[in-house]
Amino acid sequence: KTAFYSGATPLAAGAIIGGGNDEQIEALRAFGLHTGLAFQIQDDLLNLVGTKEAANKDFRTDITEGKRTLVAVHALSDERYHDEVEAILSSGTDNPAQLARAVEIFQETGSIDYAHTYALDLTAKAKAAIENVELDPHARELFLSMADFFVERLN
């Protein structure tokens, strides 16, 4: 839902207010939706594998809060670790060892890589959405740069 109200809707509204045609409005809506989702996935990754300093007070709180992020759902789909991940997510723990164990499982199951690849795919879809639509060249370049920034924040 965040991608819809923070990305898709504002860009579509801006296109409407700016006098955009239906093709431009839809392209910017799609761009906003895809980049908004990519941004959220990357934000979830930063919460897990960034540094405590970079994530500030929210480091690994998604685990403590039991959030079913894309990373967590992917890890839960692995039968080898399902019960352990479910137990950690359901516990409300803020124990650093337990949080580290969850991240270790997320890495072992390929869930972190899966989520990052998914975010990159969403970014590619976002860029494709505006590729053949008439836009101001400076605006297009800004949109493309923003899309890249959203998924490169971890690097």
State the predicted function of each range.
Residues 1-155:
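All-alpha prenyltransferase/terpene-synthase fold signal
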